[in-house]
Amino acid sequence: MPKLKEECGVFGIYNNLEASNLTYLGLHALQHRGQESAGIVTSDGVNLHNHRDMGLVSDIFSEEVLSELPGKNAIGHVRYSTTGSSQLKNMQPIVINYFRGSLAIAHNGNLTNAKSLRDELEADGAIFQ
């Protein structure tokens, strides 16, 4: 029987003043799902605040770093690469700035039709950075 592998970990908090600290604890509990990188994005209702780095949750997020992630909403991610390499560009959550503001997203999985989706979006006028 083939060995099962974990695939990343995603955690979120909504409407809690301790969002960054609780997300840190959630990611720490999910650390077994990914040790390559970790990230947290918080929202204070106006701005997104982001910290991501390569390594373990406890090495990336000090009390000082967590204090710089204000807001009542947060998403966090720990990465285990099933595709793609272990590089900074593959860290999550992903933060996107666009004409309506900013958006943060974290996901666990692979888009098997990514090229056709991109082609379709570009045909409709989307611009990728």
Task: State what each model feature region is.
Residues L121-Q129:
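Conserved glycine-bearing catalytic or ligand-binding loops at nucleotide- and phosphate-handling centers
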